[in-house]
Amino acid sequence: MSRKDKQVHLSKLAELLGRSHEVRGRSRHVHMTPPDEDLLWLESWQAERLAMTYGDLHAQDRYRPAVKFFLSDIYGAKDFSRRDDDVRRVYPLMSRVLSEEAIASITLAMDLHAMSQELDEEMVRVLRQEMEVAGELTPAAYAEAYRRVGRIEDRQRQIELVCELGAVLDAVVPNPMLYTAVRLAHGPAHLMGFGELQDFVERGFVAFRHMRGADVFLDAIYQREMTLHHALREGQHPAQWYVPPQEMVVGDYARP
């Protein structure tokens, strides 16, 4: 990755910080209840669905760390605002300490999170205000809200971003020099105030290095999520998509 590529990622990261801040501010003015509670309510349900969908991979030692990384650091039901604030605070220092690959990983993760925030915000608005769902979130209610929100291209892009992030991590770990450079940044990153970001990158690299090749893992994510996405779009009953992966009829969706 060239210096120019690094600057492109840094510029994109600055844009994403503003986007994330805007979404958080807008959310606080839209919902009657505290937005974090509403969003965590939805995200917790989604995390449970993902844990079930990828339970077969989690059961395999080769893929378990990568599944945990995606469930906790990418799709986790937790507030990422502190991480976003840390990026904003130390942004001027990042280019001097973090490698190009680390910045690329953070940028893709932030892009994915910003898009997920916007989609989740829309889901919460539909569920809470239009559908008046107040108690337990059911697969049927989720499916209906998903269809009402629409944003088909964004949903597909969300899946693609997950796979792009995985591909970046997978490309770095076989290179001992790049992998070592990322690990050597651990001390300086913590001293300069963005250790949480560095730890995020390291967790991803360690998980993907353990996997020894991510094609099967990333293909499974793309095929399963695209299959579920199209099932939801087409109005299928939840029984046809909210199922364990071994019972899922996976469509023919090739990862780009």
Predicted features and spans:
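Extended, well-ordered protein cores
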Residues: S2-P256
